[in-house]
Amino acid sequence: MAFFNLYLLGYQHYFQSKKRNTAQETNQKDEVPTRLPPIISEDGNYSVHQNSHERYQEAVRKVLLKTFPNQVFRVPVTDAQNFSFWRSNIPGVRPEKAIPWIKTPHHCLIKSPMTRFVDHSHLNDKTFSLY
């Protein structure tokens, strides 16, 4: 922020300011709780593991936990994350079906320039090898 002549503002929390706020704020003050609150993670993965370490390990192994940046942050933090913000959160839907413009037709070359070079060199010299 020095280029705006703003100094001594402390550290800027760029990632923290972009993160989704999962905690719900209440204005009313609750009474003092008589028991401990249930252990529920703030990232929304509780329904997957339900406080079971074995289920958590299985979810990590099968990649069932929230891992995409669009599930953690409100806006893309870096330019590399722009693609994941276009993705659909519906499980089982391929990106080509949800976003048809990312699929383009393939126009392959049957005889590429390298293939033509190798064929021509092999016809002229039977001992020709690329290696």
Curated annotation (Swiss-Prot):
Record-linked Pfam families: SPMIP11
GO biological process: flagellated sperm motility
GO annotation, cellular component aspect: axonemal A tubule inner sheath; sperm flagellum
Keyword Zinc-finger among record annotations: no
Domain of life (superkingdom): Eukaryota
Chief location category: cytoplasm
Subcellular location, record wording: Cytoplasm, Cytoskeleton, Flagellum axoneme
InterPro entries attached to this UniProt entry: SPMIP11
Segments passing through the bilayer: none
Keyword terms, alphabetized: Cell projection, Cilium, Cytoplasm, Cytoskeleton, Flagellum
Assembly and binders: Microtubule inner protein component of sperm flagellar doublet microtubules.
Function field: Microtubule inner protein (MIP) part of the dynein-decorated doublet microtubules (DMTs) in flagellum axoneme. May serve to reinforce and thus stabilize the microtubule structure in the sperm flagella.
Name listed for the protein in its UniProt record: Sperm microtubule inner protein 11
